[in-house]
């Protein structure tokens, strides 16, 4: 499906990315994404933190999960939109560069469902956590202070809401 809904979804996602850049700059908290861009019944799946349901739970997860990662960025590489479906390739980028000048980074993919009115009802982030830890080790990165700790047994059900 293409047309108005794809354009609307792409525009909403572009606004979400712009707001995320403000978050990364320290201007607003991660939870600020929830009020504007997610539905009340949103489902958000993170590979380390698992499934989070409802805007309030997702806002709490976002703030807790990003503690200690304030110097990381998450630049977009590309985004595809097909109707209500948005797929984005992005980077988990740590501070610094490798000796050859490349950034320390690991890829990530997000799958989102656009619900209309500028909001998303589903996001599933996919990344290789082993690779993220390898990049952390290679870079010598360590958090400046406390870091958010994921649950020991998160719900990893990626089923979208019906």
Regions found by a protein language model. Give the residues of each.
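Hydrophobic alpha-helical core bundles mediating ligand binding, dimerization, or RNAP-core interactions
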Residues: 13-20, 38, 58, 62-65, ...
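Short acidic-aromatic low-complexity motifs
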Residues: 2-40
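A solvent-exposed, acidic/Ser-Thr-rich amphipathic alpha-helical stretch
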Residues: 30-83
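A beta-strand edge to alpha-helix "cap/lid" segment located at domain peripheries
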Residues: 2-8, 66-162
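Phosphate-binding glycine-rich loops and adjacent basic patches that engage nucleotide phosphates
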Residues: 16-28, 52, 71-76, 96-97
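Short N-terminal signal/transit or membrane-insertion segments
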Residues: 17, 43-52, 150-160
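A structural signal for well-ordered alpha-helical scaffolds and beta->alpha junctions
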Residues: 9, 27, 55-58, 105
